[in-house]
């Protein structure tokens, strides 16, 4: 080989055997550093909300309407209309959302990235997004991919004669894949029952998952594991849709409404289909699933392997889905690709062909469509919708809006002229500010009043944390605004220590009432604001106890929600099963406590340094649930010291597990053997894990006390304001 052809690098940065390969159980902190400015190409001062406000939404919609019926030779439109394809694209963008952790959903435009862009359930959606590129290119930064995908779904419905409930923009794009747990299977569409199965017992789906197989959005349309049993499929439908916050009525409306349009594609065997986008060659330029069956497109398209058109008007809103569902008896058959589907017995050919106007077909359905007839609860709803088309249309409009906006959080984030006026319970509504807000003098006076009540630093800090730390950056739910900590179900959560919480809230309500009653100009302080303000007072007092004067930032403007404005069932999913910041585990889990801490920190949008400083601070402030002494490595609780780190890193202490599960440890004096401290896995990980130990060493150093307090206050303030979208 000549010198010119020898490459000096056999491997490049990031290749080779990784730490994860060597130590697969190592705690992964990478999830805390996703979506930073380092991966974002936009200017530091770019504000997507402001950019969207300058968008001519009507012009974008006009262009989208034109696109719907402008069929492209490289990817022809079924029935001459892209509506069905774009409805599916929007549905699959939003439909990854799950209630358990709020992850997934349309926000961020994650359908552009792996693994979602290459899921088997998303075959051909690469083409849908590519059809949209000229419009995205035209409007540039003023509309994100995330917003455009959902807007296109809405316009598709409108262009086919359906009146939508509304549309809100405000979904800023992300620029790299989310790190989401989608399951443990190693094979796409792996069946249940294997070593990596997501099911246990009597088909009990693993939490937080909300799909039946790896690479699907919800259910297998052929039935559970491909078994064409509509009744069994109903179980899967109900479970997966419920995990996306949909009840039975919304589920029926979505399935029937979505399947009023378009068709599925199974013109030939799947063996003709090439690799998915992430595995395709460079020359494919991000497209995948290139097919060698016939022309590979149009009438020869292979997507799901099913070949079903539900209605006689697949580009027009109608009640045909229910008409066909109930008018015929159905017999099992197979698509040209060999997939299980159903055909109407003794039916005429009333279904148009997607590409040949001279052809007609008999009505066809999926196994999961028939579930809407043969499951008793679904059947009642389906018949009601069949007999009341206007009710069905309204139900679908509302369910579609919920599907496509569920992960956006409160209405404060909604942008654009088509935001519906109606406030919906699932949006966790909070009253608008209707009174003058407290000023700096009031803040100082209220802090003094709070500290004079006799409530401890621990009580003040714990209550404020419990109120604010319900926030999830995934779906923007939770947080201190609304003061829902005083309402069901939050007031009764074990992690919030209901009896102790009630005492603190009663005391703070007394301070609130006294202040509000004394005002003559209508000025008020909400309990939501006062809870956060009281926490700030506690932190300032704890810093003062450490000899450091610092002011915790505070911005009034929170309001108090009512019980009637709170969906108890929907709010229940925010209950922490673990909160390592308070050294809390609801029960024993397979997932280590330290991994649950990182997961919680990621939902709180914290970095590893922020997580570290908060744990160390909350321990010495006595914020543990049940006043547990685990991790309270200080002899001066209530003082915002760096003792947690200094004592954890002390080589004079030897740690040993004292529980069978290796989840509780004793730290003994190496010289005397006397027990000095006790701690959990969440505590000891900051001395064990090399990256976290490096951070702990920063805060455990002799010169770190002031920096520790300053960093704690900054991280604390961040958490207190995570849901303050009005401050952005």
From Swiss-Prot:
**Biological processes per GO annotation:** cellular response to hydrogen peroxide; hydrogen peroxide catabolic process
Q: Look up keyword Iron and say if it applies.
A: yes
Where along this sequence does the record place binding of heme b? 259
Reproduce the UniProt comment on modification after translation. Answer: Formation of the three residue Trp-Tyr-Met cross-link is important for the catalase, but not the peroxidase activity of the enzyme.
Cross-link (Tryptophyl-tyrosyl-methioninium (Tyr-Met) (with W-91)) at residue(s) = 218-244
Cofactor requirements of the protein = heme b
Active site, per annotation? 92
* Superkingdom: Bacteria
Would I find Oxidoreductase among this entry's keywords?
yes
The positions annotated as site (Transition state stabilizer) read 88
Q: Where is this cross-link: Tryptophyl-tyrosyl-methioninium (Trp-Tyr) (with M-244)?
A: 91-218
Q: Which Gene3D superfamilies match?
A: 1.10.520.10, Peroxidase, domain 2 (1.10.420.10)
The note describing how and how many cofactors are bound reads: Binds 1 heme b (iron(II)-protoporphyrin IX) group per dimer.
The EC number(s) given in the record are 1.11.1.21
Coiled-coil stretches are none
Annotated Gene Ontology cellular components are: cytosol
Single GO MF descriptor: catalase activity
Q: What InterPro entries does the entry give?
A: Catalase_peroxidase, Haem_peroxidase, Haem_peroxidase_sf, Peroxidases_AS, Peroxidases_heam-ligand_BS
Under catalytic activity, the entry for this protein gives: H2O2 + AH2 = A + 2 H2O; 2 H2O2 = O2 + 2 H2O
Q: Which family does it belong to?
A: Belongs to the peroxidase family. Peroxidase/catalase subfamily.
Described purpose of this protein according to its UniProt entry:
Bifunctional enzyme with both catalase and broad-spectrum peroxidase activity.
- Report quaternary structure and partners: Homodimer or homotetramer.
Name it.
Catalase-peroxidase 1
């Amino acid at each position: 080989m000549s010198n010119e052809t020898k490459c000096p690098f056999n491997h490049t940065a990031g290749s080779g055997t990784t730490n994860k390969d060597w130590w697969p159980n190592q705690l992964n902190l990478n999830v805390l550093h996703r979506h930073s400015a380092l991966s974002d190409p936009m200017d530091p001062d770019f504000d997507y909300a402001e950019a969207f406000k300058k968008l001519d939404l009507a012009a974008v919609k006009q262009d989208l309407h034109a696109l719907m019926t402008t069929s492209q030779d490289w990817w022809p439109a079924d029935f001459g209309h892209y509506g069905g394809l774009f409805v599916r694209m929007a549905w699959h963008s939003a439909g990854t959302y799950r209630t358990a952790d709020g992850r997934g959903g349309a926000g961020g435009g994650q359908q552009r990235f792996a693994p979602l862009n290459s899921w088997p359930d998303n075959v051909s959606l690469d083409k849908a997004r590519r059809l949209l590129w000229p419009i995205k290119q035209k409007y540039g930064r003023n509309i994100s991919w995330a917003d455009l995908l959902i807007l296109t779904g809405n316009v598709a419905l409108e262009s086919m004669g359906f009146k939508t409930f509304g549309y809100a923009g405000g979904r800023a794009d992300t620029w790299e894949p989310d790190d989401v747990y989608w399951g443990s299977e190693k094979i796409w569409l792996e069946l249940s029952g294997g070593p990596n199965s997501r099911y246990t017992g009597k088909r009990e789906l693993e939490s937080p998952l909300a799909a039946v197989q790896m690479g699907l959005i919800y259910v297998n349309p052929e039935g559970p594991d491909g078994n064409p049993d509509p009744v069994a499929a109903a179980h899967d439908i109900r479970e997966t849709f419920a995990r996306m916050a949909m009840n039975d009525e919304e589920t029926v409306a979505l399935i029937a409404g979505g399947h009023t349009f378009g068709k599925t594609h199974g013109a030939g065997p799947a063996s003709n289909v090439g690799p998915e986008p992430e595995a395709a060659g460079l020359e494919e330029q991000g497209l995948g699933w290139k097919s060698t069956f016939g022309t590979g497109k149009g009438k020869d398209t292979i997507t799901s392997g099913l070949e079903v058109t539900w209605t006689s008007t697949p580009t027009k809103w109608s009640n045909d889905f229910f008409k066909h569902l109930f008018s015929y008896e159905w017999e099992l058959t197979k698509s040209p690709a060999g997939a299980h589907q159903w055909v109407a017995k003794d039916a005429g050919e009333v279904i148009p062909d997607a590409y040949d106007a001279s052809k007609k077909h008999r009505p066809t359905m999926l196994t999961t469509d028939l579930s809407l007839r043969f499951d008793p609860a679904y059947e009642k709803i389906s018949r009601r919708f069949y007999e009341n088309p206007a009710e069905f249309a309204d139900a679908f409009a509302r369910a579609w809006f919920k599907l496509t906006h569920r992960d956006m959080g409160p209405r404060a984030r909604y942008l654009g002229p088509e935001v519906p006026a109606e406030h919906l319970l699932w949006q966790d509504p909070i009253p608008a500010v209707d009174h003058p807000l407290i000023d700096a003098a009031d803040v100082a006076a209220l802090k003094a009043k709070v500290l004079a009540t006799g409530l401890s630093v621990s009580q003040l800090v714990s209550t404020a944390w419990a109120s604010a730390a319900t926030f999830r950056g995934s779906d923007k739910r939770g947080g201190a605004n609304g003061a829902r900590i005083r309402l069901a179900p939050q007031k009764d959560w074990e992690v919030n220590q209901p009896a102790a919480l009630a005492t603190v809230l009663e005391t703070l309500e007394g301070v609130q009432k006294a202040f509000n009653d004394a005002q003559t100009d209508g000025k008020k302080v909400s309990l939501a604001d006062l809870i956060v303000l009281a926490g700030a007072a506690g932190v300032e007092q704890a810093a003062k106890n450490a000899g450091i004067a610092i002011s915790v930032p505070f911005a009034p403007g929170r309001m108090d929600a009512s019980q009637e404005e709170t969906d108890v069932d929907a709010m229940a999913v925010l209950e922490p099963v673990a909160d390592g910041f308070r050294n809390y585990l609801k029960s024993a889990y397979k997932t280590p406590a330290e991994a649950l801490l990182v997961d919680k920190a990621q939902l709180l949008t914290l970095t590893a340094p922020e997580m570290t400083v908060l744990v160390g601070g909350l321990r010495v402030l006595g914020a543990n649930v049940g006043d547990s002494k685990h991790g309270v490595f200080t002899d001066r609780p209530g003082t915002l010291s760096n003792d947690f780190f200094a004592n954890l890193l002390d080589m004079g202490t030897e740690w040993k597990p004292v529980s069978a599960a290796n989840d509780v440890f004793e730290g003994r004096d190496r010289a005397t053997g006397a027990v000095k401290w006790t701690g959990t896995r969440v505590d000891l990980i900051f001395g064990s894990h090399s990256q976290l130990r490096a951070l702990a060493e920063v805060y455990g150093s002799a010169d770190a006390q002031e920096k520790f307090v300053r960093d704690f206050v900054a991280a604390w303030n961040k958490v207190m304001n995570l849901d303050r979208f009005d401050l952005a």
